[in-house]
């Protein structure tokens, strides 16, 4: 079992360059399935989930190379429509190849995916949306089998029951290549990663508008062509390092970022009493006075991101008074609370609402990590705690953070990473 050992109680001071966004890179790689020319992507983070997606592309027939954060995807053998379950089970984003592969092969079979256990994240939104666009879908033995219809309707409309990021990406991608159709999708996700996917597809020849709003319009085209594209920076990684700086009452600057993507976090930090300095592509936070308790609700973008909720909880553990976080996206996102309470935190969760009473200091302990973002939250708590913390089952975090030890060490953290034996 992998573990991270942290010697806490040190102020973090310095600058962290932020990597490319995994959550932007993965759907773009899935979309590359539909492009029969070379696709070159820069600023791709070297993470386990990215390697998993590249392996999927190789297994279905693409040629792939990955070096120095640059991915090249080229045509290879005849594409296969069957994606091995041993790859799909490793992450949810693998399901995004279902639609693109069906568009190219005429059919595809993809297992229902795995990933972090943070609550219900059914692929039903994907399936119902694809059906609404005309795809024939059946489920058997844990697999989803999709078949492309002989033709699509000229005008298609679908309203998502929930602004699912994955379903928005899936439907927008396949509709881009439905040349006989104009498609309107409403109640879509508005995340920056959706906008990045639209920008990628449009540069490749698609005709899409509306990403960043709750309505996307797609005029299908016959073919997408190969391009070079630069992936946006990872706003969740940036937020993690900023919150680590606040938690240790230090001064941390993140560079290579888009501050507009972090407006919800910056608003919360301002309410906390954090000093914030922004320029075109960097953000710096520092703490000089006493922080104030706050109330926050998570929400789909542009609201406060659920992926930063565990890290914010870690910060609030040592803020005087009672803070409240209401989790409105995933019902099991507070699965880390019992472990954080082992570090002398005072957190009570009732009906998806966490009541956090600040303590003077946290104390190091041995704790067990359940998922990527919970591990990051525990790491931030450990950095501010007195003494040593051992985070067990820590491999999750390397699915979401590139060069984690190197970056934290650069700003003064004392951590050791022990991989699985």
Curated annotation (Swiss-Prot):
Pathway: Cell wall biogenesis; peptidoglycan biosynthesis
Keyword Cell division among UniProt keywords: yes
Residues the record marks as active site: 116
GO MF term set: UDP-N-acetylglucosamine 1-carboxyvinyltransferase activity
Catalysed reactions, semicolon-separated: phosphoenolpyruvate + UDP-N-acetyl-alpha-D-glucosamine = UDP-N-acetyl-3-O-(1-carboxyvinyl)-alpha-D-glucosamine + phosphate
Sequence positions that bind phosphoenolpyruvate: 22-23
EC number: 2.5.1.7
Modified residues (2-(S-cysteinyl)pyruvic acid O-phosphothioketal): 116
Keyword field contains Metal-binding: no
GO terms under biological process: cell division; cell wall organization; peptidoglycan biosynthetic process; regulation of cell shape; UDP-N-acetylgalactosamine biosynthetic process
Gene Ontology annotations for the cellular component aspect, listed alphabetically: cytoplasm
Signal sequence region: none
SUPFAM superfamilies: EPT/RTPC-like
InterPro entries: Enolpyruvate_Tfrase_dom (IPR001986), Enolpyruvate_Tfrase_sf (IPR036968), MurA_subfamily (IPR050068), RNA3'P_cycl/enolpyr_Trfase_a/b (IPR013792), UDP_GlcNAc_COvinyl_MurA (IPR005750)
Homology family: Belongs to the EPSP synthase family. MurA subfamily.
Official protein name in the record: UDP-N-acetylglucosamine 1-carboxyvinyltransferase
Species this chain originates from: Kosmotoga olearia (strain ATCC BAA-1733 / DSM 21960 / TBF 19.5.1)
């Amino acid at each position: 079992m992998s573990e991270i050992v942290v010697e806490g109680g040190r102020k973090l001071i310095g600058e962290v360059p932020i990597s490319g966004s995994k959550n932007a890179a993965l759907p773009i790689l899935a979309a590359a399935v539909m492009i029969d020319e070379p696709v070159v992507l820069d600023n791709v983070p070297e993470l386990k989930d990215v390697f998993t997606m590249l392996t999927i592309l190789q297994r279905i027939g693409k040629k792939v190379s990955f070096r120095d954060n640059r991915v090249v995807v080229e045509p290879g053998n005849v594409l296969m429509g069957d994606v091995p379950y041993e790859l799909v089970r490793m992450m949810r984003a693998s399901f995004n190849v279902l639609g693109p592969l069906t568009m190219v092969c005429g059919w595809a079979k993809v297992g229902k995916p795995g990933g972090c256990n943070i609550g219900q994240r059914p692929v039903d939104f994907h399936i119902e949306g694809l059906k609404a666009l005309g795809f024939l879908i059946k489920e058997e033995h844990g697999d989803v089998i999709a078949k492309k219809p002989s033709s699509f309707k000229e005008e298609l409309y679908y309203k998502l029951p929930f602004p699912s990021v994955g379903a928005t990406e899936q439907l927008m991608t396949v509709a881009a290549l439905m040349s006989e159709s104009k498609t309107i999708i409403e109640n879509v996700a508005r995340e920056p990663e959706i906008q990045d996917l639209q920008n990628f597809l449009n540069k490749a020849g698609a005709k899409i508008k509306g990403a960043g709003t709750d309505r996307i319009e797609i005029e299908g085209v016959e073919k997408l062509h190969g391009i070079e594209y630069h992936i946006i920076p990872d706003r969740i990684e940036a937020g993690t390092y900023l919150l680590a700086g606040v938690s240790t009452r230090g001064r941390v600057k993140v560079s290579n970022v888009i501050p507009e993507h972090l407006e919800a976090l910056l608003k919360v930090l301002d309410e906390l009493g954090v000093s914030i300095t922004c320029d075109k592509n960097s953000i710096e936070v520092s703490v000089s006075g006493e922080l104030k308790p706050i109330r926050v609700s998570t929400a789909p973008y542009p609201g406060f991101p659920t992926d930063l909720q565990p890290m914010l909880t870690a910060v609030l553990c040592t803020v005087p008074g009672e803070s409240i976080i209401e989790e409105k996206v995933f019902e099991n996102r507070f699965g880390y609370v019992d472990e954080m309470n082992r570090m002398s935190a005072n957190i009570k969760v009732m009906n998806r609402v966490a009541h956090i009473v600040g303590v003077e200091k946290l104390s190091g302990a041995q704790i067990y990590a359940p998922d990527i973002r919970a591990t990051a939250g525990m790491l931030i708590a450990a950095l501010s705690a007195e003494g040593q913390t051992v985070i067990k089952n820590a491999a999750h975090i390397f699915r979401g953070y590139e060069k984690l030890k190197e970056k934290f060490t650069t700003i003064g953290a004392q951590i050791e990473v022990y991989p699985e034996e």
